[in-house]
Amino acid sequence: TSDYSVLPVENSLEGSVGESNDLLVTVNLDAVGEIYHRIRHCLIGIGSLENIDTVYSHTQALGQCRKFIQENSLKTVPSYDTAGSVKIIKDLNKNNVACIASKNAAEIFGIPVIKQGIEDNRNNYTRFLVLSKESNEDSLMSKQNASSKKKTSIIFSVKHEAGALYQIIKEFATYKINLTKIESRPNKNTAWEYNFYVDFEGSQDDSMIKEMLQKIKGNSSFLKILGTYPITNID
């Protein structure tokens, strides 16, 4: 078993990775770090671009290469992940199908790269959360970055009361805590109810933030603290 796992949670062009964020609600792991990775997509297959009519990849990758796909009139087939789509192409062994994935994935499966850099925007980054079974304060990553500025991630849902969401959001203003992200996702267990995902600057170990989180807990029907971790800047 590994000490850490890495989960893609959002992309700078296509937004949040829904499956990953849904998983964070139930997974019993602490967020102990974040990584920003520059995404460079390649068209991979055994045929030439002129022969290809269908392309496989994860929905996020297909969305990030929308312009290239439209310009070449390609049909799209969603797959579970980008690396998995390379295996599909290898197994199909047809010159009219290709996939979108990384150059590294092409090398692993021994499939040629037809064209590199097919993403719509060069400013294409995916943010990953680093997850660990260890608590935040015990993780090696947190110890190595003990002096860094911190960020905390939480998930909560609100009660069905007028102004319930406002009562939570106003606490961040009251305590002068800077929000870096807020968004909602449907609750998979109850129709038309939502979970809210919030990132904010500061540590859950700070006494003021502890006090704020207690107030948020009192105004929410569900609260999960994913963890506190060092803030990472994009180079």
Model-derived segments and spans:
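Domain-level signature for soluble enzymes in the chorismate/prephenate branch of the shikimate pathway
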Residues: 1-235
